[in-house]
């Protein structure tokens, strides 16, 4: 492989929502050189690639940031970092205003005020939200973007980050990137579990299939402390299209009903996990399928829904048109997705302080990869990108010298990369191992197949089988650098799977139905587990760390 060494002040891994905004923030507030590495292309990468039709985190009139903290805390049944939620919430409106100035169309009423959707949301025309961010980044001073570069590991020495390693998916260049500070913004993890739709349509999922948990995996391997991986996220979505349901529930007030026409959502509770659990239970007890009731809405609401889904999930609009019946003439069937690990909706991710500093010195995290702060959505990811960006600048300014990446470290990672670029032909492919991994997680770690439920014996089997699959990855081969990326993605997912299993096993209670439904411990246990379940990889094994909650008014700082 051809090799190239690059030096920069701040390396941002991931050019999605948080990554782009971190770059903009650094550019506008310092003269630091910024390098964004994105394995796709920042114009259409990350969770915003297809667009969105609402900003789900905004402090509307007569509300305050603490109200949003309280909402997120209630939805997660207390397992949140209130200090992180508050520092995020205080920036939500500021970053929204900035987005509008960059060109995002936010709908307004006749008085010029934002059109709200519920207590925390704004309606937008957001199909082009990611190109808007990408264009701003391309115009920013001192910011360079390397598209189609896959970063696969950090360079960490004595718990301090010195940069990262990657390769060009199209160029085939092996990159050693030295940086004074690194911001990880690679999103969450999809593809761990078997998805709703099989075969050719398996990509039809709620979370981007290209978000493979790379940031989580690199942090886990480097010994960073992680938090709350047991709080998986399962999205309640329109059946088959896996289109969002919030547009229906909040946009036209559609209630969850069973096949008998009974409204069941209030029977189980209205938190995110309870809405999924209720749907699963109604189906199990023979009252399915379940729907969002749209029959009888107005023609104007019909038109509004058709347009809204074009901004985010056009397949749902196409499905209505293809059937010849608008939503006013047919209820929308719903189902739960496979579980994901995503710190923008639940609290899974890096254990960080209020500066979004991880437990590895010089490494900061923002967006879905950062833990403790659920219900971020778009604006929360922007807010965390800003916080991480400013913190990285402050960190660099506080240091007098920075260590270089050693030749030994570079040569080791180069050898580990090149070993897959051979002409050997094993008995199995990367895709086959990925499908095997998803089958294991689906069957033994609480996937769709088991209605998201698991017991400790199943988790033990899952852990054993995932470790077996991990050993098989050493024999894989890649004909080109695209296939090499697929191998990296598989290894990332397997690393994350092991942490998910360890966390599910460690929380010996059921606090969130469906999200973490432990059949051996079916009740909530506030006495023992009204706490964070954290973990750190030590000597090749996952060590569980139980930490007390950081509650209102407290501020956590890394100390041990």
Write out the residue ranges for each language-model feature:
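Glycine-/small-residue-rich beta->alpha transition segments that form the dinucleotide
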Residues: 40, 181, 185-190, 369
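Long, amphipathic alpha-helical stalk/connector segments used for oligomerization, subunit docking
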Residues: 397-479
């Amino acid at each position: 492989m051809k090799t190239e060494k690059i030096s920069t002040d701040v390396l941002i891994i991931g050019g999605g929502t948080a990554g782009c905004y971190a770059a903009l923030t650094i550019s506008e507030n310092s003269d630091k050189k910024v390098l964004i590495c994105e394995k796709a292309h920042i114009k259409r990468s990350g969770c915003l690639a297809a667009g969105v039709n609402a900003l789900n985190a905004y402090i509307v009139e007569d509300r305050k940031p603490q109200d949003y903290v309280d909402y997120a805390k209630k939805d997660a049944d207390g397992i949140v970092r209130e200090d992180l939620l508050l520092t995020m919430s205080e920036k939500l409106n500021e970053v929204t205003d900035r987005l509008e100035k960059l060109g995002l169309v936010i709908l307004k009423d006749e008085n010029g005020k934002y059109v709200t959707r519920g207590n925390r949301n704004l309606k937008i025309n957001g199909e082009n939200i990611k190109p808007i961010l990408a264009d701003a980044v391309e115009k920013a001073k001192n910011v360079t973007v390397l598209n189609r570069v896959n970063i696969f590991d950090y360079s960490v020495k004595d718990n301090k980050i010195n940069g990262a390693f990657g390769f060009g998916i199209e160029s085939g260049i092996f990159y050693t990137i030295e940086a004074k500070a690194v911001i990880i913004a690679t999103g969450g993890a999809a593809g761990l579990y078997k998805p709703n739709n099989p075969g050719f349509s398996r990509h039809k999922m709620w979370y981007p299939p290209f978000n493979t948990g790379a940031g989580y995996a690199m942090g886990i391997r480097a010994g960073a402390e992680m938090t709350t991986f047991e709080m998986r996220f399962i999205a309640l979505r329109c059946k088959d299209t896996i289109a969002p349901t919030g547009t229906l529930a909040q946009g036209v007030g559609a209630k969850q009903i069973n096949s008998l026409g009974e409204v069941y959502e209030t029977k189980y509770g209205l938190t995110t996990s309870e809405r999924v659990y209720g749907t699963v239970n109604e189906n199990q007890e023979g009252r399915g399928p379940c729907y969002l009731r749209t029959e009888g809405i107005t023609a104007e609401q019909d038109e509004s829904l058709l347009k809204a889904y074009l901004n985010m999930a056009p397949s749902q609009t196409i499905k209505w048109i293809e059937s010849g019946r608008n939503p006013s003439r047919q209820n929308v069937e719903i189902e739960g997705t496979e579980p994901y690990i995503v710190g923008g909706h639940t609290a899974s991710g890096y254990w960080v302080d209020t500066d979004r500093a991880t437990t590895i010195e010089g490494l900061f995290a923002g967006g879905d990869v950062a833990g403790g702060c659920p219900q971020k959505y778009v604006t929360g990811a922007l807010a965390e990108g800003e916080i991480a960006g400013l913190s990285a600048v402050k960190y660099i300014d506080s240091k007098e010298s920075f260590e270089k990446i050693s030749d030994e470290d570079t040569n080791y990672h180069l050898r580990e990369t090149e070993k897959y670029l051979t002409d050997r032909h094993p008995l199995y492919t990367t895709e086959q191992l990925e499908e095997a991994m998803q089958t294991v997680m689906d069957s033994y770690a609480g996937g769709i197949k088991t209605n998201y439920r698991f017991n400790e014996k199943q988790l033990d089997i899952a852990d054993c089988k995932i470790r077996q699959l991990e050993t098989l990855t050493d024999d894989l081969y890649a004909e080109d650098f695209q296939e090499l990326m697929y191998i990296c993605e598989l290894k990332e997912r397997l690393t994350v799977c092991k942490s998910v299993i360890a966390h599910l096993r460690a929380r010996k209670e059921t606090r969130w139905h469906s999200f973490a439904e432990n059949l051996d411990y079916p009740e909530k246990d506030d006495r023992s587990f009204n706490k964070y379940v954290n973990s750190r990889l030590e000597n090749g094994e996952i060590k569980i760390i139980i930490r007390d909650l950081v509650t209102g008014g407290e501020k956590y700082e890394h100390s041990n």
